[in-house]
UniProtKB/Swiss-Prot annotation:
The TFIID basal transcription factor complex plays a major role in the initiation of RNA polymerase II (Pol II)-dependent transcription. TFIID recognizes and binds promoters with or without a TATA box via its subunit TBP, a TATA-box-binding protein, and promotes assembly of the pre-initiation complex (PIC). It comes from the Eukaryota. Residues 1-88 are annotated as: Disordered. The gene is Taf11. The keyword Phosphoprotein applies. This is Transcription initiation factor TFIID subunit 11. It is found in: Nucleus; Cytoplasm; Cytoplasm, Cytoplasmic ribonucleoprotein granule. The keyword Nucleus applies. SUPFAM superfamilies: Histone-fold. Pfam families: TAFII28. Coiled coil: none annotated. Keywords: Cytoplasm, Nucleus, Phosphoprotein, Transcription, Transcription regulation.
Length: 196
């Protein structure tokens, strides 16, 4: 009757490499392994110890079960990825022109004063603000200013001028970012009707 219900079940006593661990456990528990012609007594003792413990040296023992790498190799690959990223940044910075290098250094050094950001946020919200929120807001403000400055530099380059950024370039950059919907609304609202 088992042959009808389970037609894929093999009657051989030998185990192939593709068999599951559960199948090995059940066959060793039922005593079918003792009748095997291919195993020698030395391997039976080792195999009995492995089956009784449930351990198998050929299987993954790191506990996550989803990959074949141990946990210490995953940490190593994460460290390697961080090191590769650092090397890429070093190559990129080494290929900067003098102007780009100065701009990059100023960007790295620049930050909004946290006390001023905290005071501004507390006056707007009317409640106390934690230090983590202040750090996040100063980072967001730095990214926002970076986008405006980048767009202003594009405007200046498109108009064929060079030198320091002037207010007219920054105003044009803000206007362009508003038309691209990449600028928060703030006080500026587009008119509902246009009279032309």
């Amino acid at each position: 009757m088992d042959e009808i219900l389970f037609p894929t079940q093999q009657k051989s006593n030998s185990l192939s490499d593709g068999d599951d661990v559960d199948l090995k456990f059940f066959q060793s528990a039922s005593g079918e392994r003792k009748d095997s012609d291919t195993s020698d007594p030395g391997n039976d003792a080792d195999r009995d110890g492995k089956d009784a413990d449930g351990d198998n040296d050929n299987k993954n023992t790191d506990g996550d079960g989803d990959s074949g790498e141990p946990a210490h190799k995953k940490l190593k690959t994460k460290k390697e990825l961080e090191e590769e990223e650092r090397e890429r940044m070093q190559v990129l910075v080494s290929n900067f022109t003098e102007e780009q290098l100065d701009r990059y250094e100023m960007y790295r050094r620049s930050a909004f004063p946290k006390a001023a950001v905290k005071r501004l946020m507390q006056t707007i919200t009317g409640c106390s603000v934690s230090q983590n929120v202040v750090i996040a807001m100063s980072g967001i403000a730095k990214v926002f200013v970076g986008e405006v400055v980048e767009e202003a530099l594009d405007v200046m380059e498109a108009q064929g001028e060079s030198g320091a950024l002037q207010p007219k370039f920054i105003r044009e950059a803000v206007r362009r970012l508003r038309t691209k919907d990449r600028m928060p609304i703030g006080r500026y609202q587009q008119p509902y009707f246009r009279l032309n």
